[in-house]
Swiss-Prot record:
Stated role: Catalyzes the reversible interconversion of serine and glycine with tetrahydrofolate (THF) serving as the one-carbon carrier. This reaction serves as the major source of one-carbon groups required for the biosynthesis of purines, thymidylate, methionine, and other important biomolecules. Also exhibits THF-independent aldolase activity toward beta-hydroxyamino acids, producing glycine and aldehydes, via a retro-aldol mechanism.
Catalyzed chemical reaction(s): (6R)-5,10-methylene-5,6,7,8-tetrahydrofolate + glycine + H2O = (6S)-5,6,7,8-tetrahydrofolate + L-serine
Subcellular location: Cytoplasm
Gene name tied to this protein: glyA
Cofactor(s) annotated in UniProt: pyridoxal 5'-phosphate
Coiled coil: none
Main location: cytoplasm
Documented EC number(s): 2.1.2.1
Any one of the GO CC terms: cytosol
Protein name, UniProt field: Serine hydroxymethyltransferase
Length: 438
């Protein structure tokens, strides 16, 4: 036996473990959090994949559900003490099914990439052929890009957009599908600003015996709000993130109307790809889905699209070259090649001016992903903040001012313009405050 005296509570538990806030317990992390809150309050967020969640979503995600392991599914867990977890996960499932009018929903994927990976695990085998929209045409890494798992484990065939109007080239899709006979055809993307003809994709999939998957991560909130065509009724399976336009926590989800596919999906998510779900995130998903079922969310979704169109139209009036000429959704893509500016220089200059967007490839982009020839801008976060068409028109002018100055003076000589725009940005943000208690 050990001769050491028994450990006291103070030996194993820091003072104030259950009572001290972050500022006292870890000032370094609290400093980073404080900086992020200040950034969100004072900058205009135009990254199309980002949004601003409600206080209720923040509260759920920061809840005691972070303590709980809940491997399995509601009513069929591998641990005890899971009744509260069953309640919130079933709420998330039921609300997702109601929101998208679908038969089955798995709310456990940790991310959109995990959701896409689970579908591939469920419905394909390594070495199978899959088809997806190429990255430079607006697709996503997980749809078969060479650098991603989907491009390494599968024979990935990539389709693109027409060079004249930058819309999906369905003649190419048909030809590639007939030639390669893919097991899975994927559509959706991260920088495609137009509606997609889901019915035509399904017809092509049926012709070649493929399954059809829609990744609606970017436009799920627009579908939920009734301002974007729904993929349900066409796709065999639908994946999404739960943030972006859906305005929930960062996470993923998989939906289908096919019971046999649903069973395969459930097994692929757990135990195939993940262990226990992140129950604090699942709880936050349930909250966000509940918010999206309210009438105000339909108005929000409509405003997101209207604001994006205003932003794109004003940028075009100011001389910007827009990929596809505009947008049907929440995002627009600006080709900077006509003004001789790179995406990296543009997004860095805009951030110095208080506007966050991201550098982005454009169709047939000659520059690498770390540099790019374009930027992507979006309206979800600004719309959540309360910006309307007048504000987005003003934002477009601020963007154009920075880009014009950059083209004329270069990154080193654009400081005066950036400082002037930053003052305008902060004045606009002060009129539309967020998180007053933080």
């Amino acid at each position: 036996m050990s001769s050491n005296p028994a450990a006291t509570l103070s030996d194993v538990q820091p003072d104030g473990f259950f009572t001290r806030g972050l500022a006292d317990a870890d000032p370094a992390v609290f400093g980073g959090l404080t900086e992020e809150i200040a950034r969100e309050k004072k900058q205009i967020e135009l990254i199309a994949s980002e949004n601003i969640v409600s206080k209720a979503v923040l509260e759920a995600q920061g809840s005691v559900f972070t303590n709980k392991y809940a491997e399995g599914y509601p009513g069929k867990r591998y641990y005890q003490g899971c009744h509260p977890s069953d309640v919130v996960e079933q709420l998330a499932i039921d609300r997702a099914k109601q929101l998208f009018n679908c038969g089955f929903a798995n709310v456990q994927p940790h991310s959109g990439a995990q959701a896409n990976g689970a579908v591939m695990l469920a419905l394909t085998q390594p070495g199978d052929t899959i088809m997806g929209l190429s990255l430079d045409a607006g697709g996503h890494l997980t749809h078969g890009a060479k650098a991603a798992l989907s491009g390494k484990w599968y024979k990935a065939v990539q389709y693109g957009v027409r060079p004249d109007d930058h819309r999906i080239d369905f003649d190419q899709v048909e030809a590639l599908a007939r030639e390669h006979k893919p097991k899975l055809i994927i559509t959706g993307g991260s920088a495609y600003p137009r509606h997609i003809d889901f019915a035509r994709f399904r017809a092509i999939a049926d012709e070649v015996g493929a399954l059809f998957m829609v990744d609606m991560a970017h436009f799920a909130g627009l579908v939920a709000g009734g301002v974007h065509p729904t993929p349900f009724g066409h796709a065999h399976v639908v994946t999404t993130t739960t943030h972006k336009t859906l305005r929930g926590p960062r996470g993923g989800m998989i939906m289908t109307d096919d019971e046999a596919i649903a069973k395969k999906i459930n097994s692929a998510v757990f135990p195939g790809l993940q262990g226990g779900p992140l129950m604090h995130v699942v709880a936050a998903k349930a909250v966000a889905f509940g918010e999206a079922l309210r009438p105000e969310f339909k108005a929000y979704a409509a405003a997101v699209v209207e604001n994006a169109k205003v932003l794109a139209a004003r940028l075009k009036e100011r001389g910007a070259d827009l990929v596809s000429g505009g947008t049907d959704t929440h995002l627009a893509l600006v080709d900077l090649r006509p003004i001789g500016v790179t995406g990296r220089d543009a997004d860095e200059a805009l951030e110095r001016a208080g506007i966050t967007c991201n550098k982005n490839g454009v169709p047939n982009d000659p520059l690498p992903p770390v540099k790019t020839s374009g930027i992507r801008v979006g309206s979800p976060a600004g719309t959540t903040r309360g910006f309307g068409p007048a504000e987005f028109r003003e934002i477009a002018d601020m963007i154009a001012d920075v880009l014009d100055g950059l083209a004329k003076n270069g990154p080193e000589g654009n400081g005066q313009t950036e400082a002037h725009v930053k003052a305008r940005v902060e004045a606009l943000c002060d009129r539309f405050p967020i998180y007053p208690e933080l």
